[in-house]
Regions:
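Conserved acetyl-CoA-binding loop-helix of GNAT-fold acetyltransferases
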Residues: 74-76, 80-93, 105-113
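Extreme N-terminal starter segment of soluble prokaryotic enzymes
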Residues: 1-2
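Acetyl-CoA-dependent GNAT
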Residues: 6-77, 85-90, 140-141
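Conserved active-site tyrosine of GNAT-family acetyltransferases
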Residues: 20, 111, 116, 136
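C-terminal "cap" of GNAT-fold acetyltransferases
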Residues: 101-105, 124-143
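Residue-level detector of beta-propeller blades
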Residues: 54, 118-120
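Conserved hydrophobic beta-strand within the GNAT/NAT acetyltransferase core sheet
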Residues: 69, 96-100
């Protein structure tokens, strides 16, 4: 089940914070940042739940005409089951931007499969280890 978080979803926010530390290590969002994304008018978080457990999540910044994916992740035991795809499909209503570590080939291939195109590189964007970010964009045809 996919759910859009509200500030009352304290347990899910805590789960996301813990997953962020496990998955993204030093580049993880803080608990406060995660809570702020839920509270703000221009951002939101979707979670994919199985038996009240967060198995995947999508953090999005909602600009007027585009979305920016801040984070998308699936826990290890739930990978390759289409969870990230279902989460991404929820926001394919306007153009989407994201950045991804250049070494994260699995994610890059996932994005390419979803019609994201590389548009730029940010040199040295990530730390621990220092690494370039690939900026990607998916355009939605609203004809």
């Amino acid at each position: 089940m996919i759910k859009k978080l509200t500030i009352n979803d304290v347990d899910y926010i805590e789960q996301i914070f813990n997953l962020e530390k496990d998955i993204f290590k030093n580049s993880a969002f803080s608990k406060e940042s995660t809570e702020n994304l839920v509270k703000a008018d221009n951002s939101f978080i979707y979670v994919y739940l199985i038996d009240e457990k967060v198995c995947g999540y999508l953090m999005v910044l909602d600009s007027i005409d585009v979305y920016e994916i801040l984070a998308i992740a699936t826990i290890e035991e739930c990978r390759n089951k289409g969870i990230a795809q279902e989460l991404l499909d929820k926001i394919k209503t306007k153009d989407i931007f994201l950045e991804v570590r250049e070494s994260n080939k699995k994610a890059i291939n996932f994005y390419k499969k979803n019609n994201f195109k590389q548009i730029s590189i940010r040199k040295g964007y990530y730390s621990d280890p220092t690494e370039d970010a690939i900026i990607m964009k998916m355009e939605v045809n609203n004809e």
